[in-house]
């Protein structure tokens, strides 16, 4: 039986990565979530990070939020451009799965294209990954 999981190389795991994406990337708001999006240096590799504070609710609510965001990303990640995404809840309401799918399909490409159009220099923490599983590197 094949498990549909999100592989480790498709996740944002380290604090340094989260800081880089939030500082160097652009942000946009979906229906119930906030996306921080930064272009990826690796073609064909889209990464996801999720942050949920304790203000959102108890552990079972936070875990459910993370679970549905991961599943929506897993369904849409092959149609997304190469980028790094950090997702945060906008308020204390649980988002609907269908809304998340729609937000991933519409908001992420728009935020990434606006970031590339502005083309402003990045400041702050630079992140250089060592052990990535993405094959080709963008110039």
UniProtKB/Swiss-Prot annotation:
Enzyme class: hydrolase
InterPro entries the record matches: Ribosomal_Su5_D2-typ_SF, Ribsml_uS5_D2-typ_fold_subgr, RNase_P, RNase_P_CS
GO terms assigned for molecular function: 3'-tRNA processing endoribonuclease activity; ribonuclease P activity; tRNA binding
One GO process term, biological-process aspect: tRNA 5'-leader removal
Residue spans of biased composition, Basic and acidic residues class: 129-139
Gene3D superfamilies noted in UniProt: 3.30.230.10
Cellular component annotations (GO), alphabetically ordered: ribonuclease P complex
SUPFAM superfamilies, A to Z: Ribosomal protein S5 domain 2-like (SSF54211)
Location of the region described as Disordered in the Swiss-Prot/TrEMBL record: 120-139
Keywords noted in UniProt: Endonuclease, Hydrolase, Nuclease, RNA-binding, tRNA processing
Protein family according to the UniProt entry: Belongs to the RnpA family.
HAMAP family recorded: RNase_P (MF_00227)
Designated name of the protein: Ribonuclease P protein component
Organism: Chlamydia caviae (strain ATCC VR-813 / DSM 19441 / 03DC25 / GPIC)
């Amino acid at each position: 039986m094949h498990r549909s999981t999100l592989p480790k190389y498709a996740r944002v795991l380290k604090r340094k990565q989260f800081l880089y994406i939030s500082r160097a990337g652009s942000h946009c708001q979906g229906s119930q979530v906030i996306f921080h999006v930064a272009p990826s240096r690796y073609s064909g590799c889209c990464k996801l990070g999720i942050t949920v504070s304790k203000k959102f609710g108890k552990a079972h609510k936070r875990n459910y939020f993370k679970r549905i965001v991961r599943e929506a990303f897993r369904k849409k990640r092959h149609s997304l451009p190469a980028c790094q995404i950090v997702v945060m809840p906008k308020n204390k309401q649980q988002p609907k799965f269908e809304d998340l799918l729609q937000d991933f399909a519409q908001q992420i490409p728009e935020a990434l294209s606006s970031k590339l159009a502005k083309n402003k220099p990045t400041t702050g923490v630079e992140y250089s990954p060592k052990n990535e599983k993405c094959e080709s590197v963008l110039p």
